[in-house]
Amino acid sequence: MDLASLRAQQIELASSVCREDRLDKDPPAFIGGADVGFEQGGEVTRAAMVLLKYPSLELVEYKVARIATTMPYIPGFLSFREYPALLAAWEQLSQKPDLLFVDGHGISHPRRLGVASHFGLLVDVPTIGVAKKRLCGKFEPLSTEPGALSPLMDKGEQLAWVWRSKARCNPLFIATGHRVSTDSALAWVQRCMKGYRLPEPTRWADAVASGRPAFVRWQEIQR
């Protein structure tokens, strides 16, 4: 595994990330959610992609792709491991979203290329990274109240917003993926909340990927 080459690719790709608002359709008609997991001890990469109507946030389509994992887990290089399955699920969608939430980091990455940014560049779609853990940077401790907010900073640069979306829950790290500004990324996540820790697009992607009760109930209603 030539990590020096992958690192150079990350730096080059990161320079192409658009950190400004460049939505083709604003407000979007459809917002997507993406989540990646691994099965069979990491041998299989599973990506779930969902499509929600906006502003109702109603689930209208989902696709799950499973492919052989092509790369081991190496911190800081996760997007190279995850994007092939994401691309396979994306290509199955009959309708592509105008904005995509990705479970993972955007520019809040040591080389400014988390999976939300990498995938956004690959398919040239506006993306937002919604991560559950910090990868780099520092932030001031948040109060315990829902709505508590702090910028994630690294070397004098804001990489994300750290936002407590729900009481007694760990905060989310919300960042530009591609073609969405940092402030707009936060605003879009806030518009897509329905009382859970996660915004609806990534909550549904996780539900589909893991076969959670909410998704099972949705399937039963569709029958």
Swiss-Prot record:
Catalytic activity: Endonucleolytic cleavage at apurinic or apyrimidinic sites to products with a 5'-phosphate
Pfam families according to UniProt: Endonuclease_5
Gene Ontology MF terms: deoxyribonuclease V activity; magnesium ion binding; RNA endonuclease activity, producing 5'-phosphomonoesters; single-stranded RNA binding
Keyword Nuclease in record: yes
HAMAP family associated with the record: Endonuclease_5
Role of this protein: DNA repair enzyme involved in the repair of deaminated bases. Selectively cleaves double-stranded DNA at the second phosphodiester bond 3' to a deoxyinosine leaving behind the intact lesion on the nicked DNA.
Protein name, per record: Endonuclease V
Native source organism of the sequence: Salmonella paratyphi B (strain ATCC BAA-1250 / SPB7)
Gene for this chain: nfi
